[in-house]
């Protein structure tokens, strides 16, 4: 079961991807997590990625594609995987399709978590992220047990630069220009499914599960 999660930044696709991965015992492959690990470790890739992410811009294809392809080739992906944050552009999608075709495979589903822009801005302004492990929280619906401290590792949680309202607006503009065309791309391939991302998270997940098990 090979799944791509689509949707604007802050639509909740990462949360849903993790739940899918847990339920079906397949890896959750998040480019965001990979980038944050590189940023934390101060790698050259991390420094380059951070410069783009802090501006609300997309990390260029060449910094992303090979990394994801190598991850997909690992043994734990042989029964499937959930891609979260990749592909983000038509060239990335075409590269992924070509790479999978070479090994006689293709994606099974592209699931679009659909949320209006206004909801996204409001939602992300109350999001907090752990500086150490990348865990995300919502100060209303998913607060930390101790304010400002990550439940998972005990490190500080902050409003990330790329979650600030002015950056979110820019990220949404970039999304509509570069990433939303993927909706049409996967619709043409016949694998696009859409769910209403404004619903409670458990209802969104129930809708996704119904699609995967139909």
Predicted features, each with a name:
Residues 1-214:
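Glycine-rich phosphate-binding loop of ATP-dependent small-molecule kinases
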